[in-house]
Amino acid sequence: MEKSQIYLELDGFQQHNFLYPLLFREYIYALAQDHGLNRSTISLENGGYDNKSSSLSGKRLITLLYQQIHLSISANDSNPNQFIGHNNNLYSQMISEGFAVIVEIPFSLQLVSFLEGKEMAKSHNFQSIHSIFPFFEDNFSHLNYVLDVLIPHPIRPEILVQTFRYWVKDASSLHLLRFFLHEYFNWNSLITPKKSISSFSTSNPRFFLFLYNFHVYEYEFLFFFLRNQSSHLRLTSSGVLLERIHFYGKVDYLVEVFANGFQDILRLYKDLFMHYVRYQGKAILASKDTPLLMNKWKNYFVNLWQWHFHVWSQPGRVHINHLHKDSINFLGYLSSRRQNPLVVRSQMLENAFLIDNAMKKFETAVPIIPMIESLTKARFCNPLGNPISKPTWADSSDCHIIGRFVRICRNLSHYHSGSSKKKSLYRIKYILRVSCVKSLVRKHKSTVRVFLKRLGSEFFQXFLTEEEXVLSLIFSRASFTWRXLYXGRVXYXDIICINDLVNHDKLXXXXXXXXXXXXXXX
């Protein structure tokens, strides 16, 4: 028990970290203003945030903070609504972004202290997004079941604050965090509205990603810890315990007596391993276990969220899929494992033999229904998938309109070109091409036939050109703190996500800051 307690507290901060005074340092807001840290997530409007958050704005904000504290002390006013950022959107955003930089400092210091004296891995394996398919083929082809988990959002801000207390012991910072969550983002209801999450993540993307990943990290930390404790035969360090000795004796007895008749039962003890992958707001847990054990893992997830994090989660958020029958939605693909029969004719002298082999093939298909729903939302087609014009782009030049459609089509084509069945992809490209033509026809008040005759075949060649920039998936070989703790191989990768089609001219791929970990037995 003491060993488990030390294990769980190994990464926590036991000393007091006074982060609140850093809010009065000008360089904090300069770091928050650095777009090298927020380039992929912040959307700039009306001239951008650069012109507003100058060094002068930072100095004014610090002066107002000192004045606000002086007035609060002199008037003995504890009303939090009088905070300086409450009535000023600019200063509110600056404070929240600066606070996001501050709360990341303890975790950065922890990572630096861990890496001191250790040699950093210099080689990084840069692969395209299609490297995920051989990864699944090599690791998932022999598995049976997959848990498709939809990670719930923390719906009570106090849960986040209490979890954060294990890492940072600064009371002022905790009060400020509580204030941001309650006042600005309206997370003080039992059921979090979707609009609150949307405005939260849009106005303060860095702060949102930090809190979300911090919350998910906590539940994953407990998950990996309990998972390793359940893998009895793989924990050699726990063999000194008396109950574990009896456990090994029972297993040896089972191996000796029931070795021939109960191989499946023995596999529950000897082959208890799994693969865990997290991306965006979902997680996948794949294993070769029986349906009984997969149901136990499903109940574990639900109970962990409800009893430890006080987050209400319905069992329907965790689906058990059989890879032979069902498909899993992963990274924009519908992936499944099929048994393809293969008949081979073999002839030896005068005798001929027909050998029937069942080969396992990992198939990936484009989810056509969600793609059409996205195109419908972006006004490229109707709910039936029929292309329509894009009237909001009518004020742009012809070259600009064509360029927008071409960029979207190229990115979608590149991202989904790894599919084994491309019929759905061809339909999506057809919708975009026809929507582009109808948008130009509507702008020039012409007909489709006349317009295509004037443009010629060169118009469609632009949609068939290779994509200029290749989207990449980075697998890092650097070691992290918990890699030495867990009795398994853990790999990390940055999973890319596709931004909304409406709000961006270019269908860019942005780092979602959600780590995907694939854990297997060492």
UniProtKB/Swiss-Prot annotation:
Primary residence: plastid
GO biological process, one term: RNA splicing
Function: Usually encoded in the trnK tRNA gene intron. Probably assists in splicing its own and other chloroplast group II introns.
Keyword Metal-binding on entry: no
Gene Ontology MF term list: RNA binding
Family: Belongs to the intron maturase 2 family. MatK subfamily.
Short name of one Pfam family: MatK_N
Keyword annotations: Chloroplast, mRNA processing, Plastid, RNA-binding, tRNA processing
Protein name, entry field: Maturase K
GO CC term, one of those recorded: chloroplast
Source organism: Sapindus saponaria
Cell location: Plastid, Chloroplast
